[in-house]
Amino acid sequence: VDGQFQDLTLHIVDGKIEFAGAVPAGAEVIDAQGARIVPGFIDTHMHGAVGVDVNGATAEDLETIGTFLARHGTTSFQASVLTDTQQQTEWCIREFNRYRESPRKGAELVGIHLEGPFLAKEYKGAMPEHLLQNTNIDLVRHYQELARGGIRYITLSPELPGVLDMIPELKELGITVGIGHSGATYAQAMEAISLGATVGTHVGNAMRLFHQHEPAIFGAVMESDLYCETICDGRHLVPGTVRMYCKCKGLDRIVAIT
């Protein structure tokens, strides 16, 4: 209440909170023992869990991932597909469809994140360089049709030829645009933002960093209202960097990812 945690008793019926108040007669009581009860987490950028790689995950594998995530408080996730062959990406999408359409016990798969293939080779990270492309909006349309509208997020490098022209079309397809894996200048990144990009993908990793004479894509992310993906594992970004991001962007613009 008003940004503060309260000591309350919650009445839950069929998995939904009915009200906060006195315990009804005959109700089962679960004592949280002082722990905080919060809404389920949403992991917007994840590539797998418990030994399962999203790029090779069957619907059954995705249930393994979803069960693990739910056990640790994550109730929804987007599956992030690394740049792969068209054949393998299509296979992944079909398996995602199968998982989403079947009864499941674990976290809900709320969308697909295409991390590529429109990424800069110089900042490719783990992406296979020979599969990277400049632009191909028809390919994205094909994937989105196959996914039945399930592609919710894509990461692009703004400096690649033709990528800026793709952004409005991607928005029309219902896809959130993130910028990353990029050596974009400040001006290129700001143009991408003006055209509709709304997320900085794992900011500070696989990205051209700030210089006082060229703030680059990093500076554009920090200055703008973009959401700032932040890998909070203590390795990709040290704790001091995460604290700096939080102060620069404000907590409402930080997206903690795994």
Regions found by a protein language model. Give the residues of each.
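Histidine-rich, glycine-flanked metal-binding segment
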Residues: 1-38
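Active-site-adjacent C-terminal substructures of enzyme catalytic domains
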Residues: 166, 188-258
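Divalent metal-binding pocket/active-site signature
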Residues: 114, 121-137, 141-216
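Divalent metal-dependent hydrolysis catalytic cores, especially in the metallo-beta-lactamase
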Residues: 47, 63-95, 107-120, 147-159, ...
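Charged helix-capping and loop-helix junction motifs
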Residues: 58-61, 92-95, 136-138, 212-218
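Active-site loop-to-helix "anion-binding N-cap" substructures in soluble metabolic enzymes
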Residues: 41, 48-57, 78-88, 206-223
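Divalent metal-coordination and catalytic microenvironments
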Residues: 10, 15, 34, 45, ...
